[in-house]
Amino acid sequence: MSFSQAVSGLNAAATNLDVIGNNIANSATYGFKSGTASFADMFAGSKVGLGVKVAGITQDFTDGTTTNTGRGLDVAISQNGFFRLVDSNGSVFYSRNGQFKLDENRNLVNMQGMQLTGYPATGTPPTIQQGANPAPITIPNTLMAAKSTTTASMQINLNSTDPVPSKTPFSVSDADSYNKKGTVTVYDSQGNAHDMNVYFVKTKDNEWAVYTHDSSDPAATAPTTASTTLKFNENGILESGGTVNITTGTINGATAATFSLSFLNSMQQNTGANNIVATNQNGYKPGDLVSYQINNDGTVVGNYSNEQEQVLGQIVLANFANNEGLASQGDNVWAATQASGVALLGTAGSGNFGKLTNGALEASNVDLSKELVNMIVAQRNYQSNAQTIKTQDQILNTLVNLR
C-alpha cells in the first residue's frame, strides 16, 4: 500500500482551496475573472493508478456586472474586448479593469501606472486617426484655440400685418425706422465677440429689407443700404434673399470674420408680435480645459470653458481568438501568448468588439455563494485524503505489531 495517492490528493485539494480562496479574495476586484482548478488522474501501467494531479487552472471570461460609479474616467467593457496597456518598458498588456487616472504627464494610466493606449486625434479641429498605430492617450491642459465664425443663422417669424415704418431712411439709432431688431453674436480669429445687430424693415407686402451692423466695433459705419431683401410668397414662405455674406469689423488687430448669415425657415404670418425664434453660429472664443470624460464609443473628450468640447483620442480594444490562452500577470492584467493568438485591434461597438459604458466599472465575475460551496467541498476532499493517510498508517501499525 502506498501513501502517494493520498498525498497527491492532498496537494490537489490544497491547490483547489488556493484557487477558491483567490476567487473569494478578489470578489470585489474590478475586472477580475474567476479561476477553476482542473484535475487529471495519474496512471502508470496499473489499474489502481497513482493518484491525481492538477492539469491546469482555467479562467472564466464571462462578463461581470456593470456597476455605475459616475466617475468620468471609469469605463466598463461588456462582451468582447480588453483595454490595451503599455508599461514603462513598452511591453503590452491587456486588462478588463477600466479604472483610469492621470499621471504627472497627464497620460491616462491604470492604478499601476500602465498607460492606456488608443488612436490619436490630430488636425484642426482634431479628428480620430483610426487605423493609426495605437499610442498612449494624453489629456493636455492646453488652451482650446478660438474659431472664427463662418456660418450663422437666424430664424424669425415676421408679422404680415405690420405697417411700413413711418420714419425714413433707416437708421440704427431710430427704432421707428425699423420693425424688428435681432442680434447674433459671432467671433473673429482671436475669439473676440462681435454682436451683429440685424434690423428688419418692411418695405411693402411680402418684402422686408435686412440691415446688419457690428455694434461691437466702435469704428463700424452705420449701414445705409440693405444687406438683403427677404421675399415671401402669399403663404408666408420665404422664397428669396435668405442668405447674405457679412464681414465683421476689426477688434484688437484680429482678422475680421466673414460669414454667411442664413434666414432659412423664417416665415411671414399674421402671428402678432415679430419674434426671433432661434439664432446659431459655429464660432467660439478660446477656452480652458474644465473637465473630461470617456464616452461610450471610447472617445476621450475634453470640455472647455467656452462651452465647447474637443475629442482627444479614442480607446482601442483588443480581441483574441482564445481568451483562455492569455497569461495572467497579476495586477489584473494579462499578456498575449501563442495560445491566445495575436491581438486584433478595433473600437467599441465595431465588428466583434464589445460595448463600453462610461462612468461605470465591470465588477468581478466571482459568484461568492458558489465559491463558498466549492470551498466546503474542497475542504471535505482534503479531509478525506488525510483520512486515507491515517487509515494507511493504522494498517502499517497493525502489520508492524504482528508476531
UniProtKB/Swiss-Prot annotation:
GO terms for cellular component: bacterial-type flagellum; bacterial-type flagellum basal body; bacterial-type flagellum hook; cytosol. Keywords: Bacterial flagellum. It is found in: Bacterial flagellum basal body. The keyword Membrane does not apply. InterPro entries: Falgellar_hook_FlgE_sf, Flag_bb_rod_N, Flagellar_basal_body_rod_CS, Flagellar_FlgE/F/G, Flg_bb/hook_C_dom, FlgE/F/G-like, FlgE_D2, LlgE_F_G-like_D1. It comes from the Bacteria. The keyword Zinc-finger does not apply. It holds the Pfam family FlgE_D2. One of its GO terms (biological process) is bacterial-type flagellum-dependent swarming motility. Belongs to the flagella basal body rod proteins family. This is Flagellar hook protein FlgE. It comes from Salmonella typhimurium (strain LT2 / SGSC1412 / ATCC 700720). The gene is flgE.
